[in-house]
Every structure is written in C-alpha cells, then in structure tokens.
Amino acid sequence: MPIKILSPQLANQIAAGEVVERPASVVKELVENSLDAGANKIQIDIENGGANLIRIRDNGCGIPKEELSLALARHATSKIADLDDLEAILSLGFRGEALASISSVSRLTLTSRTEEQTEAWQVYAQGRDMETTIKPASHPVGTTVEVANLFFNTPARRKFLRTDKTEFSHIDEVIRRIALTKFNTAFTLTHNGKIIRQYRPAEAINQQLKRVAAICGDDFVKNALRIEWKHDDLHLSGWVATPNFSRTQNDLSYCYINGRMVRDKVISHAIRQAYAQYLPTDAYPAFVLFIDLNPHDVDVNVHPTKHEVRFHQQRLIHDFIYEGISHALNNQEQINWHTDQSAVENHEENTVREPQPNYSIRPNRATAGQNSFAPQYHEKPQQNQPHFSNTPMFPNHVSTGYRDYRSDAPSKTEQRLYAELLRTLPPTAQKDISDTAQQNISDTAKIISTEIIECSSHLRALSLIENRALLLQQNQDFFLLSLEKLQRLQWQLALKQIQIEQQALLIPIVFRLTESQFQAWQQYSDDFKKIGFEFIENQAQLRLTLNKVPSALRTQNLQKCVMAMLTRDENSSSFLTALCAQLECKTFNALADALNLLSETERLLTQTNRTAFTQLLKPVNWQPLLDEI
C-alpha cells in the first residue's frame, strides 16, 4: 500500500481514540473547556451512562457566531498562539483537539452566546463528514454542548462500553476530581433526570472543608491537617491526613499542578518519603494537595490526555514537597481550623446542601472505588527494616524504615486531642456506678434469650413499645416510661453534676452574632460555663468560638442549640430545662439501647432527685381488659 495523507475525517477519528476513551473522557474535556471560558456555574446532564446523551451547560464567556464552525475544526484554539504560550500554559486545554475528536464519533450540537450578541447561535456536526450547520437559537450568555449517540459510527468502540452504572461512576469520579480543585465553581451532576451531585461555590475555608468532606468523606476531614508551604515561586497547600488515617488502597490521593490533576512519580516519591517512618509499605497516605509554580517550570504537553507532567527542576520540587508535608506532620498541634456558623446549620434549615449519593451509583469514599488518578506506588516491602524509636523525627536524609503509627505509644497529637475526644466518662463517674447497674449493662447482651431484665430500682423491663416507651413491672404493678422524657431527664441530671466531663472539639465552632444575640450571650455566659461549655469571646467582632462541650451532649447539633438559646424567651422555663428541650432525642430500635439509657439515668439519681424519675412512670391499669376476657 503506497504512502498517502489520511483524510481529515479519518485523522480525527484516530485522534479520538486518544482523547475519547469513554463517556467520562468527553465530560472531562467539555467541563475543562467551560472552566477555561470563565464559567462559575456548570451543569452536567447524563443519560444512560453517557452513551445516549452528554450535555454540558455553563455561564462562561461564550463563542462568537463567526467562530462556531472553527471551534469544531482540528487544531483550532483560542488558548495559545505561539511557542511562548505553549511553554507557559495555565489553561486546562490548549491543543484544540477535543471538540473535533468528539464530533467525529458522535452527533454534536454546540449552542453559544456572548455578552455582546443579542441572540445565540447553534452549530451542528455529525460523524465522519463533520459538515456543520449554523442557525439562530435561544440561549443565555454561555455555552451548551450536547453529545448524542457516542460512538454511533464506530460500533467496535461502542461495544467496549461497560454498563450504564459503571460508565456513570467514571463520570462521577471526574466531576469529584474537578470539583475538588475548583472551589469557586458550582457543579450540578444529573443522571437520567435525577440530581446526583450538587456542589455549591466554596470560598471560605469552612465551605471548602465541607466540599472536601462531601468528596473524600467526613473521616478524612476529621483527621486532616491544613498545609501551607511556600518557597520563592513554589506554593504547596491543601490537606494531608494524619498517619493513623492510612489507607489500605490508594483511593484518597489527589494532587494538582496549577489546578490540573496529574500523576507524577516525583511527587509520589516525595509524599511517600514524608510518611516513610510512620506507614508500612502496604499502607497509603491520604491527601489533597495543590501545587502552584511558575508555568515555565513545568511541561504539561507530555501526555495525550495531559495526566502527566515533567518538571524542569525535579529535585527542587521533590525536596519542597517533602519538607512541606514533613513540617505539617511534625507540627500537628499547631494546626487548627475554625468552622463558620453559616456553613454548619442544621440540615433541615439548609436550602442548599451537598446531596447524598444516589442509590444507583457507588457512594463516596471509602466505597467509591479506586481513584485512577491517584499516584501509583510500586514499592516492594523491605526486609530487615531498622527499628525506629517512638519519638517522631524528621531527618534530612531519607529513611528506609517506618514507625507504625498504630503502635501502643501515642503521638503528641493522640495524647492531646484524640485521647480526650474518645474519653466518654470521668474515672470518678465510673467508680460511682453501682454493682447492680454494672450487672444491668452486662445483662443487656442476653436480652433476646432472657426477655426480662431486672433494673436497679427493682423494676423489670418487659418490652419496648413502638420504640417510644418501656413497659416496666414492679411486683404486681405495671408502668409505661417515655423514653423521650427519660432522655431529657438524663441530660438534666448529667449537667447538674458537680464535676462535668468536657470534650474538646477537633474543629472549633465559630458563631457570628448580632448585637442582640451577643447581649443574650453575656446574660447566659455563666449558665453555659456552669454546664460545661467553653467559649472564647470576641466582643469587638461580635464573635464566639466554641472549644469544649459537655460530653453528655457531644452527639448533638450544638450549632442549632446554642443559637436557639440566644434567641429564646427570657420568661420561659429555666435555662437548663430550655436547653434540654432543644436537644434531639435518640430513636431506640432495640431494648438493649433503652435499658442502657435507663441504667445511666439511675446511676445519676440521688435521694433528692429520685422524685423526678418516679413522676415519669405512668401506671398501666390492666383490670378493665382482664374483666373483658
């Protein structure tokens, strides 16, 4: 066969093999185009896993009418003009291949309008011929790209597509990756008409943390350390997880270079070395890192899908990242976050929130599957590793061993924070538990077989009624005990103790108040302090920071509770009664849980306050029913 130049149509389809691997590849290219156009609101609509329809709508700058046809041509772009631009790329796209490649294997419709235009225009291209048709359309400022029937003219490619669920899970991963670096952009992802993801803009640090938690999980945020590290033109920021939050698979490793997610061996090696003395070789660190540097110092044009980069000074980048992460791990006690009240309101009161994953796809971490963009580690386990002491050390040289962070010797942070967070009862309180109450707690494991358990007040628990009440027996008498009222009594008794156990908040809560709310705070500050709350007051800024809470209330929505107390009617019930009325009662689905609550309440009872408990017992008269038998 003689050598000849390929037709543009065939060349585009060959190029599409690199750019358009699956529907997720199309979504990635089109969303990156929207971001390059300055969009801060992007909606992604998917049908049947992307095989039938992919629609990307944005509010970017739009494309002028005279450039619409050119936008679908190969090697046509507005992002670079000469070699100097290519050597200093900051945009996500720059080759001008995506739209041409996508349109060659699908039916593509592009509708756009610029701010200067009075009407929008639409261009349509289909398949191999790639002939375009332009006509007027109705559309706001911005662009909408619809990709229908992907691979309709390449059956061999289409048959390799997986199930709709699998293909959509790859699209979902792409959106999560992009949303993790573009905090100022709102993303909405739908599948077959149902909203699956909805990320609102996140400018403040607390809002960014909320998005990170929605993508990486709450446990990652609870164990993450904020990192800020600078040297000349290099800037490293983001979050690294403490070593005790290590992973068995490399599924929570995200790294971005100038806003672009990449895989790079230099970065992977630096991160691995920073954790080397804390993690075994079969464990992986969790991190979300953003590296900003001079675009002239990195080449992003080395991979067909731009997933890999090449640094001009690899050793400098390696040492910079290693030192930054090592410094963050070594100074865990000095890193703190403040959560804004506006970002942590009660879920029912939020008009916009991060939605939970739809049942039809795999939820977020840790069951969302392998992160294909996480750095790949291939280090083999090392034999005869040297022993390391329990004292954290960060030598300048590279260590070949590791210290197991899960060993018996706790780190400084574990001693100061985690041990305090996990403590639930003070030693004195545990000593006060009566022998009978202790027996009740141990007996709860035998409820199913015994059905009747004796409590310390000589009451026998017979049954849990509709998850709301306990049916109790004392001699020949029967009583109903409301579990909701019992919980509120238990809270009041716990908060009346002479020594109240406190729990430190890993992430302090910041309240920004109005003048009237701050005046109410000054009135009730002693009451809050008396029951175990610890605030830091900033009168000039009308701001409160909540650092510690009573352990009995550690699972409550304290943001809502505190704000409700600062706006309550002064002439209503007492402070403690009003506070307990704001707390959310637990739902009891098992008799064992209800008996634990009863035992804990009885432990707090004394001769002076036992009357409050007996008043909750409502007698049950069986005689009328027995007479009818």
From Swiss-Prot:
The name this protein goes by in its record: DNA mismatch repair protein MutL
Keyword Kinase listed: no
Entry similarity comment: Belongs to the DNA mismatch repair MutL/HexB family.
InterPro entries noted in UniProt: DNA_mismatch_repair_CS, DNA_mismatch_repair_MutL, DNA_mismatch_S5_2-like, HATPase_C_sf, MutL/Mlh/PMS, MutL/Mlh/Pms-like, MutL_C, MutL_C_dimsub
Keywords from the named record: DNA damage, DNA repair
CDD domains in the record: HATPase_MutL-MLH-PMS-like (cd16926), MutL_Trans_MutL (cd03482)
NCBIfam families: mutl, PRK00095.1-1
GO molecular function, one term: ATP-dependent DNA damage sensor activity
GO cellular component, as recorded: mismatch repair complex
GO biological process: mismatch repair
Biological function: This protein is involved in the repair of mismatches in DNA. It is required for dam-dependent methyl-directed DNA mismatch repair. May act as a 'molecular matchmaker', a protein that promotes the formation of a stable complex between two or more DNA-binding proteins in an ATP-dependent manner without itself being part of a final effector complex.
